Every structure is written in structure tokens, then in C-alpha cells.
Amino acid sequence: APSRHRITDYIQILLWSNCSNTNASTSRKNVALSKADFAKRVANQLKPYTTPAENTLAKEGETVFMNQCVRCHQVNGMKRADGTPVIAAPDENMVSGAAPNLSHLMSRNTFAGATFDLLNKSCREDVWTADSESFGDKYLSGVNEDCLNQKDLRGWLRNAPAMKPMYANPALLTSTGGKYRGMPNLGLTEADIEKLVAYLLTLK
């Protein structure tokens, strides 16, 4: 039988919470990866931000993100047209003072504090039923357009409180000083949502 040292040397246990006090789920995903696959995972998380190409739907989505989402959500490396870094301010807008960092979002399997799957059902089953030899590659491939759980992600962007009530209407929470207790309904148009989804798909 393999020694405890050998087992420890072979795997790395990754615990992904990606949540704040305001939209956390008790759900957790524990993933065992070989040392080589773990190194790939780390390398991917350290990749610098790449802005979408000009005149693309994703580029328009980046603009929507800057105008609507960065009040709470950080994407590391994002810059405005003048070169200044885009810095989220959840401490100014959230009761908890924190919100999920969305850098490399599509390298994850879930969103909204692990409440909803980013992968659609067929792709999720393909990953989580894979044998040990192929699991690493499937898991690390992340989420692409064909595998994205479009229904839940679009629904979340359209009206998050309807999917996961979180007292996100500051008008009803005078004691918070107008700060959110979760993801609010931002009043996005369907065109905004289309652009945002295209942009979020680039965050791998």
C-alpha cells in the first residue's frame, strides 16, 4: 500500500469557497489533483489579465462589467482606457466588505458561493464521472461556451435575488446605510447580459 508520505506527495487538496459572508453557501468542492495538474492550476491562476479584442461582444461586456460590476467584484489586472487599474470597492458597497473575486471565473465549476453550477449538466457529469487518468485534464479545461450553464448564469445576471434571496435591496435596509447584503438586481438589459456572458467566458 502507498505510504502516507507518498499519498501526500501525490495529491494536493484544493478547497474552493469563492464566497463572502453575504452570498456564501455551505457547499464546498474538494478536488484531488496530481502534483503536475496542481502546478498547471497554479500557473493558470497566475496568468496576467488579457483584455478582449476590440470590436467584439466580449469587449463590450468588459465595459458593462466596469460600469456595473466592479463596485463589488474584482478582476485582477483589468485597466481602464487610460491605463489606470480597475479596483473593486466592496468595502464601500457591501455590508460584509467582501465579494467574490471573478478573476479566472471560468476555471471554476460553480458560482454564487457554490450555489449554482457553471457547467451544464452533461459537461458536469463528464468531468465528475471521469476516471482518475483523465479527470485532471477535464477539470482544468474549465468552462467554454458549449459547456456553460447559460440558464442559471443569465438568470443570476438578470435578477439574482429571485434565485437566491439575500436582502439585496438597500431601500429596505436602512440600518446598512444603503450597503448591499448580497448580489442585487442591477436592472441589466438583455443586451447587457449578452455582452457580460461573452466577457465572463474570457475569464479562464
Locations of regions flagged by a protein language model:
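Extracytoplasmic electron-transfer domains, predominantly the class I c-type cytochrome c fold
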Residues: 1-15, 40-56, 88-200
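Short cysteine clusters
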Residues: 15, 69-72
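Detector for the c-type heme attachment site
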Residues: 20, 72-79, 107, 158, ...
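Extracellular and select intracellular beta-sandwich modules with Ser/Thr-enriched
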Residues: 23-28
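Short, acidic/hydrophobic/Gly-rich beta-strand patch recurrent on exposed beta strands
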Residues: 31
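Electrostatic cytochrome c docking/interface patches
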Residues: 34-66, 81-84
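Structural detector for helix-capping/boundary residues
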Residues: 67-68, 151
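Alpha-helical membrane-anchoring segments
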Residues: 68, 76-78, 86-88
